[in-house]
């Protein structure tokens, strides 16, 4: 059950990062319905997403890595081929702007889950809203 659960969390994060919001929400619902903690799920997701954010920041910096793969490795993404290819796809799907916003969005989600949205429907909605913010259809603040 542990590895299956872990795989499902990774699939959920991959789906959300790739803009497959409906799939991510469906996986989230399955995990929550199975009794998983919203805070625990978001903590696991945050670990992965912070690495994407770090890679995007490295790529935009003055001493940037030579490739997307190198930036991801430097950010702490596992160097086995499947992990790197999924991370590259996620980073490309999210784009640098949304990747750089992830820490702020994660902090807001964390505060919300630890306050009024700690359980039940409010927790589910807070995480769903976060996935929607990650979606490629979500506009940047300066876009109309």
Language model region names:
Residues 1-13:
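Solvent-exposed, charged amphipathic helical/linker segments at domain boundaries
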Residues 8, 17-144:
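Helix-rich C-terminal "collar"/helical-bundle subdomain used as an assembly and partner-interaction module
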